[in-house]
């Protein structure tokens, strides 16, 4: 019985150790320097970068004010429900996803 308990504890420890080695999600990160994103983040080509250990989602926010379009892409701890809003000439798109590089398009 003692051996079974020891083996169970060992299995749990190994599982937790291997789980901690999993890679963090990788997201496209751009447009974070501008308050409303940047224009190059809309169509630029970027490599996905590793996010923080608590981040589980990639996010994308696109803003069009009628004259220019800007975007901001990055990492998030929480899910952002997809939304498309338009108010006069201003339109916004927000979304999140949870696979590597999924916020590229």
Curated annotation (Swiss-Prot):
Main location: secreted
Post-translational modification: Contains 4 disulfide bonds.
Pfam families to which the protein is assigned, alphabetical: Toxin_TOLIP
Compositional bias segments (type: Polar residues): 92-105
One term of GO molecular function: toxin activity
Expression sites (tissue/organ): Expressed by the venom gland.
Compartment list: Secreted
InterPro entries according to UniProt: Snake_toxin-like_sf, Toxin/TOLIP
Family of this protein: Belongs to the scoloptoxin-05 family.
Other comments on record: The scoloptoxin-05 family has remarkable similarities with the three-finger toxin family commonly found in snakes.
Designated name of the protein: U-scoloptoxin(05)-Ssd1a
Species: Scolopendra dehaani
